[in-house]
Swiss-Prot record:
Subcellular location: Endoplasmic reticulum membrane
GO terms for cellular component: endoplasmic reticulum membrane
Enzyme class, broadest EC rank: transferase
Gene Ontology terms for molecular function: fatty acid elongase activity
Known role: Condensing enzyme that elongates saturated and monounsaturated very long chain fatty acids, to yield products up to 30 carbons in length.
Record membrane topology: Multi-pass membrane protein
Protein name in the entry: Very long chain fatty acid elongase F
Family per record: Belongs to the ELO family.
Amino acid sequence: MFAPIDPVKIPVFSDPWITMATLSGYLLFVLKLGPKIMENRKPFHLSGVIRVYNIFQILYNGLILVLGVHFLFVLKAYQISCIVSLPMDHKYKDRERLICILYMLNKFVDLVETIFFVLRKKDRQISFLHVFHHFAMAFLGYLYYYFHGYGGVAFPQCLCLLNTAVHVIMYAYYYLSSISQELQRSLWWKKYITIAQLVQFGIILLHCTITLAQPDCAVNRPLTYGCGSLSAFFAVIFSQFYYHNYIKPGEKSSKQSAIHKNL
């Protein structure tokens, strides 16, 4: 069995078998067992639990965001244009580990959101995009930690400034929309969360491209290619989601209005 490249392990998920069992159980429950169990049951009312979960996610992601910004722009532990993991004896190595551990654990906390969808029978929200995104972030992030170690190109660039910032906005929206139907209808910025996610993927892809264009940048190039490719793939499927949910309905409304005018 391979051993993690960094001797400092992630709490709970240091054993790859626990990680694989957790992710396999997630897929089995949200795609098969959960819907089967809920088939003849009424949806659970989890409003209070979900509000607490949303507040927790806002605070958790906010903490990682603050730590990440401090790490990048106050401590200046990385050269932004060429992000390489800190050596084991670097004075900021423990800070790098802490941020990455918090981020990795949060990717497993994110899986709970899909379980809420199953228990509330929100089948439409259990889409390929949703399940794949959550699974891939936890699974690929874990493989990155296990074989590469903490930090480097796949972490603080998207972790500190982009991914966690988007999640703070997203969970703030979820919390506010859960308070009442009236407040939910007044929240006009839902689609801009998806736009922010698309901008995030674009920035990550651009950063990976700039990194790879520097022959003297000592990053792990296959991992950088992988990070950029995954960002491009996410950009495509999130763009499809945006089109089908925000552009296409408007096109249908415009066509219907034109038909009525011509009658």
